[in-house]
Amino acid sequence: MRSHVNQRHERVLEIVRRRGSLRVTELAGELGVSAVTVRRDVEALAEQGRLTRLHGSVSWPERPRPLGHGPEPTASGTEAPAPPASAAVVLGMVVPSMEHYFAELVKGAQDAVAARGGRLVLGIAHWRSEEDTAQIGRMLDGGVDGLLLQPSWERGVPSTAQEEQLLALRVPAVLVDRRVPLGGRLAGLDSVRSDHVLGGAAAVHHLAGLGHDRIALLAQDNPTSPQVREGYEAAVAARGLSAPPIVSVDPEDPAALEAAARLLYESVADNRITAAIVHNDQTAIGVVQRLREWGLSLPADVSLVAYEDEMAALADVPLTAVAPPRSAVGEAAVEMMFARLGAGPGASAPSRHVSLVPRLTVRASCAPPR
């Protein structure tokens, strides 16, 4: 039995010496054995100093050590640190959708991975938590080195099962554009997100600065909305403004969109509000179209700020809008992952939670109230 293992080890060394570096899954394919077996072989040979093991890949060391010798010590006598992540790195990324918002985020991540010589593998969960699980499993089976995850959490909050899945991952993971619950079990995971609380507050402060004191919020029911609402409510309270009821709206439901637009129209006509923040652009443009049909105009009758800024500039009256830094979030997630991979297996570097500030762009849809 041992002779078979030794023969396989020699074959592993022969392939890696010839190729220079390759992924564990590629090595398993050449040998005709499972990836689990190859990982075991690579770990044994790396401990002997005969190979260099990276996350999900293996390379030929500059100075391979003779059989039976352990890892080469540094000048201080301690074991040399793990090598940094390299061009062999493959990252998996799971997002709930590839609509505009997510497409830009993915593009930012893709460009950042490519700039480092790596590869990004994409999975789309279609807003289903069970599909998150399936995509993550597929990527782990494929031997990815790390995961960038934007889970389909209901209202932005993970269930116990979703938490347990993330805690059990055997590769590093970065949460993307998801807020880690305060004091929750996921606090040890790295995360990077747009600060939608600040984004919602920025919209209120802009309108209040123009003199508006009755500002409505129309928001979708998705993982981002609770944070936009939180920022809206905090800014309204800080400014001492009246707070009209928050309206939830589904832009994909024509009846719901019609009802929300009608409520906004009646609130303007009765002078209950003078301005509105609408999440997202699709909803905002749909509402504006209805208001125009019913005789209201922007910004003469009502001021409006859209939250998302993907197509807000294309409205008949270009909409002032808050833009989450989607591409920058994707780039930052990749940077965070490569830093984690470069620290080596078992490294005790503290986890990082990074939030990026959205940008408000002033266009033609806001003016002081009449």
Where are the model-predicted features located?
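An alpha-beta-alpha
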Residues: 201-241, 350-365
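Extreme N-terminal segment that seeds HTH/winged-HTH DNA-binding domains in transcriptional regulators
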Residues: 1-30, 64-85, 353
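Alpha-helical recognition/docking segments in bacterial nutrient-uptake
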Residues: 4-7, 25, 43-48, 54, ...
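Hydrophobic alpha-helical segments within soluble ligand-binding/sensing domains
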Residues: 180-182, 187-217, 255-265, 324-343
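Flexible loop/turn connectors
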Residues: 266-370
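Short beta-strand elements in bilobed, periplasmic/extracellular small-molecule ligand-binding domains
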Residues: 114-124, 217, 233-257
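Periplasmic-binding protein-like
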Residues: 92, 144-153, 216-219, 269-280, ...
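Short, solvent-exposed amphipathic alpha-helices that sit
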Residues: 11, 101-115, 199-202, 223-242, ...
